[in-house]
Regions:
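Hydrophobic alpha-helical transmembrane segments in multi-pass membrane proteins
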Residues: 3-10, 16-20, 171-330, 389-428, ...
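Hydrophobic alpha-helical segments of integral membrane proteins
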Residues: 133-148, 156, 164, 171, ...
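Non-globular, low-confidence helical/coil segments that flank catalytic cores
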Residues: 46, 75-94, 132, 201, ...
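Hydrophobic alpha-helical segments of membrane proteins
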Residues: 156, 308-321, 343-347, 372
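Membrane-interface helix/helix-cap signal primarily in integral membrane proteins
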Residues: 3-7, 19-182, 468-475, 481, ...
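Residue-level signal for inorganic ion chemistry
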Residues: 47, 137, 151, 277, ...
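Aromatic-rich juxtamembrane segments at the membrane interface
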Residues: 115-236, 243-244, 434, 484, ...
Length: 677
């Protein structure tokens, strides 16, 4: 025991061991190949229901058989209403590997599930219950969920008490944008509140501190079993370690208990370090412990202000690494909301759960909170976009904060680091052309060096991809506005998400094609007029610094595809040609009017349809690389085999195979990257 006490009280041993294990864990989880116990040929799966929910028009169930599986099943009232936690079900269907991100810097669903030890998704054709729940803990969970299912405020009871974030996507997004989402997940603040109630009760019945700590740990462990979450997992391990320290009088420092918490977390679940909730919870707790001496001297209001500012500062790298923007108003919101959540909302949630008569009162408070959050989240002036920082920069950031506890002058380095990250796009001398994977549609980015100009050609017609992948990518490389949105023509697959774009991202000017405005274009123009965004059509050229973009207009056609904006430009010695949906007829007219030879990069017309890319045209322009934006297994049969034959002398990149493609030029050297799904 003495030797153990000596090791635990050492200033460095625990820290060194934990850091070494952390590094080993990163290597192990990223380079070791974890294999599924299922075979892709399996079509029947038996498992216990551990979670289930409705998502749009389908039931999504998580089951535990040989390993965890996600089951997708078309919505069925009868089946959904019969489901309960702990039920054993038989699922028939086909296994498939979860989708990887096919656009740069987008959310990787495959990796997200991999870190949860889920390797397959089942597209179910049938689901049958073969045994009702027999697990005591699941029985309690079912009773608790049944109790609140008809309450107006059930989503907040699930979120604040059951570790089940059932809030609507819009509300969750607003909380995330405003930097207050941590207030709506069961974490240290919530657990401390529950423990304070428990200790108040225990003080009435016993004076033995050891018994209090043991009962407290039992409570947290049972809570974790019922409602597992990463941040609660950290709280549970930390609480147990504090109890062991107290009972055996080991006198371990708080900071070392936190390191031991990480060590045991990694041993129990090596993938815990990739959980965003755990990362945030751990880092904030780490710096709160470092600040504990200061906090002891503060009154309640000063503590709230200090903790809110500290939490904001230490969360900045996590936020910009994952969301690419920081909302500076989040500090004020946290100062305002922490007491409201801890003094009003959380106690009222517990009271409402016990006494449903207060449901309307809780619903009133939460509805007001949602309205405020949704309103504030739409205020763009408080948001600062940062490009995605490297892991090295993040490590330096946290080391500087640690050193600043000894010397406050180090905080100036934080300011310079953030300024450096912010200014990086203006110092980046690379030129980029990016073809986004938008399925059967078009969307391309042209990014000039040092952020001199950013141009988006078309938007595709998938709202999720626009909001969560295209706009997200723009932010991730530090683009804060689009100088031009070029609409090649009025078809939905090319401009279907233009309104979504201008409503969610700053656009300076919009350029339309020649000919009459189509339905989607007219709808967009109404929005542009309201937002006072300038728009043009029938342009001949754009001047970008010392470079020019040419619109190869020939005449107005009866076919809208032939009225597409065909764009030619060069950067240094590289030539680019974007064909929109122009047909063979337009191609011939272009060849008659313009001299286009030895094109470096051709955006193939009309998704590789047989109506475009004639052999004569391809032979004339002689492209080195060809880009085809096409949906996987699309109903049109794009790209056409004859077109592919015409392009056989070029290197072809396709979004259905290669995902997003980045054509990058720096120091007159070309580099091509793909994001294969």
């Amino acid at each position: 025991m003495r030797r153990l006490r000596y090791i635990l009280q050492s200033n460095y041993v625990i820290k060194i061991i934990t850091i070494l294990l952390f590094v080993i864990d990163i290597i192990y989880t990223n380079y070791h190949c974890f294999k599924s116990k299922y075979d892709e040929d399996n079509t029947e799966f038996i498992g216990i229901v551990t979670n289930y929910e409705l998502k749009e028009d389908k039931i999504v169930i998580e089951i535990k058989g040989y390993e965890k599986l996600i089951v997708n099943y078309k919505y069925n009232d009868e089946i959904f209403n019969k489901l309960s936690y702990g039920d054993k079900i038989l699922v028939k269907g086909k296994l498939y590997v979860p989708n990887k991100n096919s656009n740069f810097n987008a959310f990787n669903y495959q990796k997200y599930l991999y870190y949860k030890k889920i390797y397959y998704i089942v597209n179910a054709s049938s689901i049958d219950k073969i045994q009702n729940n027999k697990n005591y803990f699941y029985t309690i969970k079912n009773i608790l969920y049944k109790k609140i299912e008809n309450m107006k405020s059930s989503d907040y009871i699930k979120t604040l008490l059951f570790c089940d974030n059932s809030l609507s996507k819009d509300v969750k997004d607003s909380y995330r944008i405003n930097g207050i989402s941590h207030l709506f997940s069961v974490s240290g603040m919530h657990i401390n509140f529950f423990i304070s109630i428990l200790f108040w009760y225990l003080n009435k019945i016993t004076f033995n501190k050891r018994i209090k700590f043991i009962i407290n740990d039992i409570f947290i462990i049972l809570y974790l079993i019922l409602f597992p979450s990463a941040s609660l997992f950290r709280c549970a391990i930390m609480s147990i370690l504090f109890s062991i320290d107290f009972i055996f009088k080991l006198k371990i420092k708080k900071i070392d208990i936190l390191f031991l918490t990480l060590l045991f977390s990694i041993i129990i679940n090596p993938f815990i370090i990739y959980d965003l909730g755990y990362i945030y919870s751990y880092i904030v707790t780490f710096f709160l412990i470092l600040s504990s001496n200061k906090l002891k001297k503060m009154n309640r209001l000063s503590k709230i202000i200090y903790i809110s500012i500290l939490s904001f500062i230490v969360s900045i790298p996590i936020t910009i690494y994952n969301s690419y923007e920081v909302n500076i108003i989040s500090v004020l919101l946290n100062i305002f909301l922490v007491p409201i959540i801890s003094i009003i909302i959380l106690p009222l949630t517990i009271v409402t759960f016990i006494f449903p008569i207060f449901d309307n009162v809780l619903f009133l408070f939460t509805s007001l909170l949602e309205s405020i959050s949704l309103f504030i989240s739409k205020i763009d002036i408080t948001k600062i976009i940062f490009p995605k920082p490297s892991i090295i920069i993040i490590v330096i950031y946290y080391l500087v904060i640690i050193f600043s506890y000894r010397n406050r002058k180090y905080l100036l380095i934080i300011v310079f680091l953030l300024m450096g990250i912010y200014m990086y796009p203006y110092l980046n001398s690379s030129f980029k052309v990016v073809m986004f994977d938008v399925g059967e549609g078009d969307s391309y980015l042209i990014k000039y060096p040092n952020n001199k100009a950013n141009i988006l050609i078309d938007t595709g017609f998938n709202e999720y991809r626009m909001k969560n992948e295209i706009i997200s990518y723009l932010k991730s490389i530090g683009i804060r506005k689009l100088d031009y949105l070029i609409i090649t023509h009025g078809d939905e697959d090319h401009m279907g998400e233009a309104i979504t774009l201008v409503n969610n991202f700053k656009v300076d000017k919009v350029i339309f094609n020649i000919g009459e405005y189509q339905t989607h274009e007219k709808e967009l123009i109404e929005v542009l007029d309201k937002k006072k965004i300038k728009y043009y059509n029938n342009l001949k050229q754009l001047n970008i610094d010392k470079y020019k973009l040419y619109f190869l207009n020939t005449k107005i056609y009866d076919n809208e595809n032939d009225n597409s904006n065909v764009i030619y430009f060069n950067y240094k010695n590289f030539k680019f040609l974007f064909m929109g949906d122009a047909s063979v007829k337009r191609e011939m007219d272009i060849l008659d009017k313009y001299n286009l030879i030895n094109i470096d990069l051709l955006k193939v017309g009309h998704h590789g349809s047989k109506t475009s890319s004639s052999k004569k045209f391809i032979d004339e322009v002689n492209p080195k690389y060809s880009l085809i934006s096409v949906g996987k297994n699309n109903r049109y049969g794009h790209p056409n085999k004859e077109v592919l034959n015409n392009l056989e002398k070029t290197k072809i990149y396709r979004t259905d195979i290669d995902g997003s493609i980045m054509y990058k030029i720096k120091n007159n050297k070309l580099k091509i990257e793909t994001c294969a799904p």
